[in-house]
């Protein structure tokens, strides 16, 4: 496994572990480098009926992050079919941020990109957890 895939897998396992610790049901579904033809996000997490999908990218520096058109459209379709909300998880040195996938812009070539400035404005893991928890519907009975 090359260092980029190894680093990405390590970040994915870290996110899965942290979300599990926060009460999520989580699976890691890495497809990078596999013979899978369908595109699925790296992480699928559920909590009380709320579904989040996370595509993870890891970089050593602040370069732009690109996602190929076919992959981006495939995981967007997966999100649509599942009813989940799609995020890009970006790991940079000393920073892990989550950005709504809709924040990516499409390039002239049809691929998708996000710059460091937008990544820096993303949510930290705790913010993502609070975001999901704010979407959990609670009935009056749950307070009794």
Curated annotation (Swiss-Prot):
Record site feature (Transition state stabilizer), residues: 57
GO-annotated biological processes: DNA recombination; DNA repair
Pfam families: Hjc
Documented activity regulation: Cleavage stimulated by PCNA123 and PCNA323 and by RadC2.
Active site, UniProt feature: 32
Cofactors that this protein relies on: Mg(2+)
InterPro entries assigned: Hjc (IPR002732), Hjc_arc (IPR014428), Restrct_endonuc-II-like (IPR011335), tRNA_endonuc-like_dom_sf (IPR011856)
Record-linked SUPFAM superfamilies: Restriction endonuclease-like (SSF52980)
Keyword hit for Magnesium: yes
S-S bridge residues: none
Keyword Protein biosynthesis included in the entry's annotation: no
Binding site residues for Mg(2+): 12, 42, 55
Keyword terms of this UniProt record: DNA damage, DNA recombination, DNA repair, DNA-binding, Endonuclease, Hydrolase, Magnesium, Metal-binding, Nuclease
Cofactor: binding comment: Binds 1 Mg(2+) ion per subunit.
Class of the enzyme per the UniProt entry, highest EC level: hydrolase
Catalysed reaction equations from the record: Endonucleolytic cleavage at a junction such as a reciprocal single-stranded crossover between two homologous DNA duplexes (Holliday junction)
GO molecular function ontology, one term from the record: DNA binding
EC number, as in UniProt: 3.1.21.10
Chain's role: A structure-specific endonuclease that resolves Holliday junction (HJ) intermediates during genetic recombination. Cleaves 4-way DNA junctions introducing paired nicks in opposing strands, leaving a 5'-terminal phosphate and a 3'-terminal hydroxyl group that are subsequently ligated to produce recombinant products. Inhibits the helicase activity of Hel308 (Hjm).
NCBIfam families: Hol_resolv_Hjc (NF040854)
Family: Belongs to the Holliday junction resolvase Hjc family.
SUBUNIT field: Homodimer; forms a 2:1 complex with Hel308 (Hjm). May form a complex with Holliday junction DNA, Hjc and Hjm.
Name by which UniProt lists this protein: Crossover junction endodeoxyribonuclease Hjc
Origin species: Sulfurisphaera tokodaii (strain DSM 16993 / JCM 10545 / NBRC 100140 / 7) (Sulfolobus tokodaii)
Organism placement in taxonomy: Archaea, Thermoproteota, Thermoprotei, Sulfolobales, Sulfolobaceae
Gene: hjc
């Amino acid at each position: 496994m090359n260092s980029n895939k190894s680093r990405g897998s390590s970040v994915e396992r870290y996110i899965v572990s942290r979300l599990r610790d926060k009460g999520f049901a989580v699976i890691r579904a890495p497809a990078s480098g596999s013979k899978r033809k369908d595109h699925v996000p790296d992480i699928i997490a559920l909590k009380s009926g709320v579904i989040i999908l996370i595509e993870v990218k890891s970089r050593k520096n602040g370069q732009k992050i690109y996602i190929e058109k076919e992959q981006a459209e495939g995981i967007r379709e997966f999100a649509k079919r599942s009813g989940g909300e799609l995020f890009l998880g970006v790991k940079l040195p000393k920073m892990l941020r989550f950005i709504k996938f809709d924040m990516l812009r499409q390039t002239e070539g049809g691929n998708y990109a996000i710059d460091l400035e937008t990544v820096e404005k993303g949510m930290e893991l705790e913010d993502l957890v609070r975001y999901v928890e704010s979407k959990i519907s609670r009935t009056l009975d749950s307070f009794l």
